[in-house]
Amino acid sequence: ISQLNAAILQELGKEHTVKAFNFKRQYPEFLFPGKTQYVTPDDEAVPVESEALLDSIGPVSWIKSARKIKEWNPDVLIIRYWVSYLAPALGFVARHMSKKCKVIAIFDNVIPHERHFFDKPLSKYFLSGIDGGVTLSPEVGQDLEELSPGKPKTVIPHPIYCDHFGTKMERKEAENLLGLEHGKKNLLFFGLIPEYK
């Protein structure tokens, strides 16, 4: 998610004045299964200057974030949406922009693959605060239409990150790099991948 956000920011920044606002905390530690929810110096991430304001579980930060973004006076606010847990915070910010500011969401998911009883109501709350959306797949576009019929939307398939992950490598070169025998079938293990992926 962060790689695509950085790429979008870079591209839009070529022709527009852009500013990134960020989470100071996305998830409470007990809900976050990974090692860290922050970019570390070891990450090969595109550096993005951003202002960390929003705490997903801190309503006071929602008010401060909305105020700070509104003071910046954007014509368009682009919000990334991927999990309903963040809908209260993101929906609050979306609702508190000026009338002239269009609020557009980029959706990885409208309804998560691992569903909970609260997903649809929270997503509907978020959707009612935005002007339109970009979905990264047709299936997510269908979910958006189901929860918010007629909401302006377009589908732009999720891009490949050539700049972030490098160019395609020839098989022999990869086998040499990994110390594998040439021409053999190799099993690549990418960790535990949920069934829906």
Task: Name these PLM-found stretches.
Residues 10-71, 140:
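N-terminal strand-loop element at the rim of the active site
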Residues 116, 142-146, 159-177:
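Acidic anion/phosphate-binding donor-loop and adjacent secondary structure
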Residues 181-197:
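Conserved donor-binding/catalytic core segment of Leloir-type glycosyltransferases
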